Every structure is written in C-alpha cells, then in structure tokens.
Amino acid sequence: MLTLHDIIYLEPRRHRSPSLYQEMGWHYRRLIVPRILKKCRKIITVSRFECERISKALQIPADRITAIYNGYSTHFSPLPEVDMHIVQQYIPEKGFLFFLGNTDPKKNTERVLKAYSLYLQRSATKRPLLIADLKEEYIDRVLQQEGIADIKRHLYYPGYIPNSHLATLYNASFAFLYPSLRESFGIPLLEAMACGTPVVTGNTSAMPEVAGSGALTVDPSKPEEIADRLLQLEQNPTLYQEQKAYGPQRAQQFSWAQTAGELSKVYQSIKI
C-alpha cells in the first residue's frame, strides 16, 4: 500500500527549481517512486485528477488507485474579530490581497506578480499584496525580469508566516490568490475558503475539483485573467458576498475525520 500525493516529478517541466532541496527531492522521487509502485497492491492519492494522472502516466489499472480527499485544521474558520496585533506583524491594515509564495515554478509566482501589476493599473483601491515565504532577493529578481519594479512599494514580504497566524491573516485579507499551475489537491485553498475569504484559483488540475463553487477560477497562465477576477471582486459587492458565503459551505464537505475513516476502510479491505 502506498499513499502518493502527486507525480509532478514524473511530468515534463520547463524550468529547474531554484531550491537545491526541491531539486534533489525531484530527482529522488523520480527514481524511487516508479520502482515502489510495481510492488503496490493499492495506491491512495488525494484527488480524482491525480488518480487519472497516475493511472495514465504509470500504466496502472484505475481500480488499484483510490482518491481520498485531504481535510483541514478546524481553527480555520470565520472569526468574529480579527486580532490586529497579529496582522500588524506583517502588514499595517486589513483588506489586503494575500498570496502564499513559493519558488517552485508550479506556484506561478511570476504571473501572480504580473497580474498584481495589471490590477494596480486599473484599481481605484490599490490594495497591498502580502506575500508569505519568499525572500526579497527572489522578489526583486522577478520584478526586474517582468519589468514591474515600480510595484514593490505595494508589496509586503515578511518571509515565513507560522501556521498559527494564517487563520487570522485569511480573515483579515480581502481575497486570497492561489492560481497555481498544478496542484494535486491544495490545502491552502480549503483553509482560505473555510475562513470565508474569497479565493481566486486556477482552473487546472485538482483545483476546480476541490473548490467547486467556493472559489473563482482563472486560466493561471494568463495574468490578465487573474487581475480581472480581483477587479470583479472589488467592483461587484454581490459577487464578493456570494464568495464569502460559498467558501465555508464548500469547505465543510472536507475533514480529517472523513479522511481517516476512508483510509481505514481501504486498509481493512486489503487481505494480507
């Protein structure tokens, strides 16, 4: 039995990861996983999308693969009041745009920053963007590469943000950006929806499967679409309130208790 969260490392890629840790992990999994899979009687993964990818890429019969969704921690929920002491450790005021950054190309950081520059050109509000988990050197390189260095004054990039502060920041933000190029599931997507934060996410891979109607989807390869969605949320109060309501409703369909129950059934079904 093997739990396999994704097979991204077996798919073609355009760029090497700038992180040595990520690059070594990519090569290790690419070498080891196909060998292990040959001996597995059952494979568990985290979405129907990933089931199909595994079956197709590795020529494994679909009935040997089971999709069991992830859950999320229950402290992610709408808060009656936002703790501004936590918020102001990262950004002066609430009502910002929030993005969990990463140097992994699939996280689409370059296009998110390009989309944000397009948003700033058209928005009357010009909300600042809080970026987690990225160093200034990397951000500067992307801004120079995209020719948008002038937007830096609107960015906040405190580096690492502990998990214990994320629920407060989701609640304090105007919208959460999660337009990845590829996700096998996407737990941050659930976390933000559970907090009642409107989400802009990708229309590819497992993201629409997880989001349902609880998030707005875009083609993540098109920065102008990402910017358009942000502006729609800003300019259409009805749409904004609908998304705030849809998110928690959708997130309630996922839980770690449900995940554990389904895992238990699969393990019990295997005869030794």
Put a short name on every predicted segment:
Residues 1-272:
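Carbohydrate transferase catalytic cores enriched for Leloir-type hexosyltransferases
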